[in-house]
Amino acid sequence: MQAKAKIQVNTNQVGKDKINPYLFGHFVEDIRDHMDAMLAYPLSDMDFESNDVTYRGLSGSWRPFTNGKSTVFALEPAATYHSGHSQLIRIYSDDEAYAGIRQAIAVKEDQLGYELALYARASIEIKFLTAEIVDTASGEVLGATRIEIESHNWKQYASRIKVSRLCEQAEFRLYVPAEHERWRDNVSTGMLWLDHISLLPSDHVGLVRKEVVDMTKDLNAGMMRLAGNYISAYHWQQAIGPVNKRPCVINEAWGGWTNKYFGTDEFIEFCRDLQVEPLICVNDGSGTPEEAAEWVEYCNGGLDTPMGKLRAANGHVEPYGVKYWEIGNEVWGPWQVGHCSAEQFADRYVRFAQSMKGIDPEIKLLACGDDKQDWNRILLERAAEHMDYVTLHLYHGYNRFGMNDRTPKEERYKAILSYPEWTRESVRKVRELINSDSRYTHLKLAITEYNTMYYPNTIRKGLPNEHTLEAAAANAANLNEFIRNSDLIEIGSFSDLVNGWLGGCIRVGDFFADQFRGKSSGRTENALTVYGTPTYYVMNMYANRDLGYVVQSHTECGNFSVNSLVPTAPKLTDLPNLDVVACQSVDGDTLTIFMVNRSLENVVTEVLLDGFVTKGTARLLALTGEDADAFNNVHHPEAVVCEVFDVPVVNAQVSCELKASSVYVLEITRYKG
């Protein structure tokens, strides 16, 4: 028998709290390959920062490029003011050979030319270098340039390499060619040192891939958060000023190196390109209140302040005016630098808040909350007067139910689709705490990280569950819960924006399954393909609607229950197959109904409109796929995308069939005739 449902929308009953566009924000962090994928640089180990992992005297991703039998490679101290290493290449003229270094990369056609920057010094007999990009399969030189070496001392050089066509199995080479004039070998000849080599395509936008910027603009994010586990050991002054003078720093949260190229100034430029509000989380782990206050001053201070002067010296005269600041990222977790008790954090928070607001009293502060109310209770008792928002991180996966991949598939599916019920319970507990004391009622809630996370964020390979239509439907239903609680929840930050862990909704390249290794430059045949997961399209569908206030609605439909293997806090029986929320624009002229079919069968649905006069057609946005496991990849980047249809409105009623495990947005315009 065909499943049926009825949705009654009453536009005469409209909520009074406006839906904040920051609800649909996003999140960037230096985790695994997030920055490698987001930024436009094709090269790795640009400062020769990694150690010699091949035992050939070369740093990290670099490999020898020589046919000389006597060429020597070694890592030596970096150039003045630089960190990492410098790369020494010792060339013997009697070899009559070419000698240099190479690295696998992927490049696109660029007639304006990739920007090449490098530091070099050489013994006087080495007069020039060749830099080229080559198709490793055919040997075709896709572009080349000549660098004249002018000094035995360190000097910066710049050029452009025009690239004739796209090639995802390319190689960058920088070398002394065999055609170089000969010299008489001795202990001080044939010496070439290199330090900091970078390439950037001409279409980069503030160092970020143009494709990533374009896709992020389409998300209409409202707010962009800079945070994550790494921030608890992040010292902001190490990532400002000339990039070559920024130190290479170990990423204490995730291993490897922090990305020094995307610091405060680049983040603000990114936000301005997107026209979104920045949210910055400060380092309360290894950092100090004074350091956090100086960060506020760097962003917001005038030219009469020390940090304002420093910002201006770095090329940014006008203050950034960053309004939203977060103190503490998952400080309750033992994996976090600065992990502490609730009492310790509350006291620490007050010190940070007072220092930061001492610089700019107009900023809004977010305090690190927890899903465990004992933490929140102590935090609010000691620090509520110093905060504007309490934060929660709400990830949803099998661990909540004691399930794993051996649990029957349908049971796992139902568990994941119960995401909004878990969020409802978490929000309810915080709401009760806030309402329990008049000193707390000014507080709002910020969900600064959320997503499906099927398994713990540790080493794992296999199906990218977070990329599926199932995950998108769960995330959409969770967004519905955010909207239902928009009187309290004002900020949401989807985790993550690009690659990183499996949750990134914009994907660069075909790396997605290995949680541990991260990106290896040029390792695949599809390194330049940029596409969105189904959840990317959910975020796009929600954030680009004209939303003002929640409208009363009632849904009659079938239901399901979750057979959890462990006790659960929320009640997980008789859950509605359709998760629905209705909204009205501020001017009252547009009605938007978000509908998620959480069942595994199609549902014929009637939407009845009460108090909203319309005629003609409505617009139906649909995110569907062949089944719940449908996902996009580099070979089929648009297997699951949002489609738009016109549907008739007859007698204030819309009929539509909602496919299984799918997300729909019904948009209706008021008739004014």
Language model features with spans:
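An active-site-proximal structural segment forming one wall of the substrate-binding cleft
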Residues: A170, P201-A221, F267, T288-Y324, ...
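C-terminal beta-sandwich/jelly-roll accessory domains of carbohydrate-active enzymes
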Residues: G558-T573, V596-G673
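Aromatic/acidic polysaccharide-binding cleft in carbohydrate-active enzymes
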Residues: D30-I31, L443-D579, D589
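Extracellular and organelle-lumenal recognition/adhesion modules and their flexible linkers in secreted
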Residues: M1-K260, E277, G287, A293, ...
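Conserved, mostly hydrophobic/aromatic
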Residues: H26, L118, N220, C271, ...
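Aromatic- and acidic-residue-enriched carbohydrate-binding clefts of CAZyme catalytic domains
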Residues: H26, S70-S86, Y230-T264, E269, ...
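The substrate-binding groove and active-site-proximal loops of carbohydrate-active enzymes
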Residues: S198-G206, R246-K260, P278-S286, G328-A346, ...
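Noncatalytic carbohydrate-binding groove/subsite architecture in carbohydrate-active enzymes
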Residues: F172, P177-N186, G190, S341-L479, ...
